[in-house]
């Protein structure tokens, strides 16, 4: 089938619901700006910018250092310390005959959208030239929309592009699931979107079906929240649009409430609710991490053992695997950074492997995938700064960010790629797509990164969307 098929039919429903989630967060951010009384007027912002030292480029970095999303920001201190030691940040960057020093100010959102707005306001009032932000819609969208409101360049990551796009006034989703309407002027982002989750998970389903006796019944554990309702509405239709011959039968476990403590009824549905009363051998979800831990423990106790579990939003970090212990074995998820990629820093030439090894050797614990995306934010900033004549001209800098095209720690990132392949193409100017790959949690440490051994590691078992990532593990049935 043609690659364009991915954008046909009901896939748009999922994109639209991610968009609406972003829209709500964007409106909430605007409400905080209006109600707080702390937001600067445009005149105040201009005055703060004029007061900034002409020889200093000020960058703000916003992430959830504390709170429910803190795992995403776990490597921040290490990554930023490394960034500050690189040549451009240590010695300055020469633009138009002037050498500018770069100053980084870090802010913690406490994993709260209203705090994200407030700390972004503080950065704007201090006269930052650029804001970088990472990790989940609850962080990224309030930051990005605040920057757009006050014409401050901003780059975001680790958020589905559909949700990010939905935060901006004038943006919309087309009937085919693409970007439509008027997008932001001062914002850019890189990550991936709804089709990439499907393109990451289904190839693993197909592999396991060839390996063991596995039916096509798919258990859906989708909560009654923004992410869960979006997946419930369109994950199955999206699979059908991309893989029309898959024959998958989806069994919805019900729109449960977040932080539910008893999943017995859902488990029974998954054990007997498939075709001809069969169990669901495949499993997909998008829950809160504690809910997956509770469900997965109870499922094991009640003898529900799917042949392959492919999970979104959870099992992204080592802490998730350690919380489940042996029940983590061969649980699969999507990943966007690994030490085993061929990619390297555009700032220093350091390989992804040595980057992760340095993190572990320095005693920061086990490497995590968010370290790669955080690093790339600063690479992108430098790429844009090298392209402008005046780093304090916000419109010029924002425009340069929207056409960045380079290779770095997360691989090739092109913010304005025209391609017939919808997995690769930019949905709109200023949106760069990176390609995830399938991993499973397995005992041990692949190749002992940094000579540190850990009990559980992500092993790369499928690279259908990103063949540049080498496999270092074999896809195996979950919990077998």
What do the PLM-derived regions correspond to, one by one?
Residues 129-255, 307-333:
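Extracytoplasmic ligand/sensor domains, especially the bilobed periplasmic-binding protein
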Residues 60-83, 107-113, 135-136, 223-230, ...:
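Extracytoplasmic "Venus flytrap"
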Residues 169, 194-195, 299-375, 387-388, ...:
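Extracellular/periplasmic periplasmic-binding protein-like sensory domains
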Residues 51, 71-78, 89-176, 193, ...:
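Beta-alpha junction/loop-to-helix N-cap segments that form part of ligand/metal-binding clefts
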Residues 358-371, 382-451:
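Segments of small-molecule ligand-sensing domains
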């Amino acid at each position: 089938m043609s690659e364009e098929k991915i954008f046909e039919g009901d896939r748009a429903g999922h994109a639209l619901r991610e968009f609406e989630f972003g829209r709500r967060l964007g409106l909430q951010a605007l409400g905080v700006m209006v109600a707080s009384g702390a937001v600067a007027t445009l005149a105040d912002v201009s005055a703060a910018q004029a007061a900034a030292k002409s020889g200093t480029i000020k960058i703000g970095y916003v992430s959830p250092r504390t709170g429910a999303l803190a795992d995403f920001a776990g490597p921040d201190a290490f990554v930023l310390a490394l960034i500050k030691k690189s040549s451009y940040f240590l010695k300055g960057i020469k633009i138009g005959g002037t050498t500018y020093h770069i100053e980084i100010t870090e802010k913690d959102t406490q994993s709260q959208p209203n705090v994200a707005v407030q700390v972004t306001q503080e950065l704007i009032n201090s006269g930052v030239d650029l804001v970088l932000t990472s990790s989940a819609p609850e962080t990224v969208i309030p930051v990005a929309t605040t920057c757009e409101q006050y014409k401050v360049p901003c780059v975001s990551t680790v958020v589905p592009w559909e949700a990010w796009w939905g935060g901006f006034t004038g943006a919309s989703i087309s009937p085919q699931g693409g970007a439509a309407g008027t997008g932001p002027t001062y914002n850019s982002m890189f990550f991936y979107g709804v089709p990439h989750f499907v393109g990451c998970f289904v190839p693993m389903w197909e592999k396991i079906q060839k390996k063991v006796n596995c039916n096509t019944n798919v258990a859906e554990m989708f909560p009654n929240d923004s992410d869960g309702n979006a997946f419930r509405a369109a994950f199955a239709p999206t699979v059908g649009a991309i893989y029309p011959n898959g024959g998958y039968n989806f069994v919805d476990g019900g729109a449960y409430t977040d932080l539910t403590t008893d999943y017995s009824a859902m488990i029974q549905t998954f054990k007997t609710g498939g075709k001809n009363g069969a169990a669901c051998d495949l499993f997909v979800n998008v829950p809160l991490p504690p809910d997956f831990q509770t469900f997965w423990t109870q499922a094991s106790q009640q003898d529900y053992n799917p042949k392959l579990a492919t999970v979104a939003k959870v099992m992204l970090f080592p802490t998730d695997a350690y919380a489940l212990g042996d029940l983590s074995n061969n649980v699969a998820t999507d990943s966007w950074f690994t030490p085993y990629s061929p990619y390297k820093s555009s700032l220093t030439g350091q390989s992804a492997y040595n980057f992760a090894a340095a993190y572990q050797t320095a005693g920061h614990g086990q490497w995590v995938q968010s370290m790669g995306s955080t690093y790339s934010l600063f690479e992108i900033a430098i790429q844009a700064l090298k392209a402008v004549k005046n780093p304090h001209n916000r419109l010029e800098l924002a425009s340069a960010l929207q056409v960045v095209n380079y290779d770095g720690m997360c691989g090739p990132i092109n913010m304005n790629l025209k391609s017939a392949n919808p997995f690769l193409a930019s949905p709109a100017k200023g949106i760069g797509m990176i390609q995830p790959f399938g991993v499973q949690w397995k005992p041990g440490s692949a190749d002992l990164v940094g000579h540190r051994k850990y009990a559980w590691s992500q092993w790369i078992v499928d690279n259908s969307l990103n063949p540049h990532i080498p496999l270092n593990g074999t896809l195996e049935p979950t919990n077998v």
